[in-house]
Curated annotation (Swiss-Prot):
Involved in the catabolism of short chain fatty acids (SCFA) via the 2-methylcitrate cycle I (propionate degradation route). Catalyzes the thermodynamically favored C-C bond cleavage of (2R,3S)-2-methylisocitrate to yield pyruvate and succinate via an alpha-carboxy-carbanion intermediate. This is 2-methylisocitrate lyase. CDD domains: ICL_PEPM. Substrate binds at residues 45-47, 123-124, 158, 188, 210-212, 241, 270. It catalyses: (2S,3R)-3-hydroxybutane-1,2,3-tricarboxylate = pyruvate + succinate. The keyword Calcium does not apply. It comes from Escherichia coli (strain K12).
Amino acid sequence: MSLHSPGKAFRAALTKENPLQIVGTINANHALLAQRAGYQAIYLSGGGVAAGSLGLPDLGISTLDDVLTDIRRITDVCSLPLLVDADIGFGSSAFNVARTVKSMIKAGAAGLHIEDQVGAKRCGHRPNKAIVSKEEMVDRIRAAVDAKTDPDFVIMARTDALAVEGLDAAIERAQAYVEAGAEMLFPEAITELAMYRQFADAVQVPILANITEFGATPLFTTDELRSAHVAMALYPLSAFRAMNRAAEHVYNVLRQEGTQKSVIDTMQTRNELYESINYYQYEEKLDNLFARSQVK
């Protein structure tokens, strides 16, 4: 694969920042905003695709094609490496997992995480989760690794076992997943900082901490996560939640006041939007490329 492969870029980012802050980008515009803010890697949440693109809950309803559409839109305009939530692999067989891996590589993703929940999955921070056997998840990991067409594409294992089977069993599963070929680990819904260190010591691969709001995991700081040997800090829906609250407020104000004057100062200006999407460069190219056709 080329030196500019997304997977290689993601691995390089891990060496430059500790922990690597990875922010969720719900769409291509947000990916560009994250890039302008100086982030080195971005994320596409499965729950974000469901809620943001489809208006549906994160209950395994989204399809692979739904996710691929959003991946392509982001990677078409943003050069930051994109980590993608692949849920359980979008199907019950190893061939489904393999197709997911190959398709995401073609779409420009840097890596994915695949989890050990059952097909009727739930949000990782909701109660009543159910997980497959350790052996079935190992098969998912093996299928994902075997399907890689880019050796630098990242296969990350997510385990939801802590809430279902307890810490010791979750660590045992994590070790099996790494032995099967997972290169990084995402232990979901961690409740204590020290647990991250226990996972890190047990598996000796980079650990991702999901610092999502309003869930089971406290909002640990990057300093705290670094002390626990966490390599990646993920903020999957932070900007999306803020965007939704801002939109809701503007809609209500417009409805109640009949004008947007009282909220205009909270808005991104036209010029700021144009700068974030490189509008002026496109316009200049348009003028240069098609100037002759405009002369009558």
